[in-house]
Amino acid sequence: MVVFLLGLFATLSIPLFYSGANSALHADARKISTVVRHLYNEAAISGAQHRIRCDLESGRFDLEFVDGAGEWRGIENKRNTLELDNEVRIRDIWSEDSGKVSSGTATLNIYPQGWMPATTIHLQSGSGKKSKNLSIHLLPLSGLAEIEEGYYDFEG
């Protein structure tokens, strides 16, 4: 009886957690929040400024840091880029220090003092009435992310 109830519960609840159409969108949002948190910690530990350069057209995130000579370099011995799934695109990025960027390249700076500008990244999958949006708000004092369904502006 217990096994039957567990099976019934799993059958009813698992589809609620994993929606095929939204899985790439949510997976990319989690990847972005994980990368930001990792670079936030790396900046605090190493004492070097880090940044993420986001190419909005290609959905590519380049991860960089300032070396001892003051030059920007890709993160070594680790993945130094993040690319979004083909189904997912960046609608725009708003940052406290640079405003809203809807095309081209946006730069997210992460400072070694344990701070980054408040930032909101808007992701979208699909088009027309079937499009889905996610808003990722990056918190300045912790590097943590709040992920919300829909298109939200957290600025102000």
PLM-predicted stretches and their roles:
Residues L8, L12-T34, N41, I45, ...:
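N-terminal helix-rich module
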Residues M1-F4:
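N-terminal signal-anchor/signal peptide hydrophobic helix marking the start
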